[in-house]
Amino acid sequence: MTPQEFIAKWRASELKERSASQSHFNDLCRLLNLPDPITADPKGDWFAFEKGASKTSGGEGWADVWRKDCFAWEYKGKRKDLTAAFSQLQQYAIALENPPLLIVSDMDRIRI
């Protein structure tokens, strides 16, 4: 996948977060010529979609993508508040072993 193909595909997409986030991340992996989570770690021990985590505020949640010792990633729908998404991800960070990068995206923007 070329950068132009990636941009064109995701600029045109109107899918909701739930139906698009894993496809978006897999396309990003293809763009960067990196293995996606399922290919890299079929058991999900160190690289996974929907990694469960206890929130520091109580309750349970899921990071949309997590790679041990690398990052946690939270997706939101297009044009959603990424500051709120970052706050949500911060609540999972301890349970996710404090990854050095917290990333949020609405599939148009990526913030690290």
Give short role names for the model-derived ranges:
Residues 1-101, 109-111:
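A short, conserved, highly charged catalytic patch centered on acidic carboxylates
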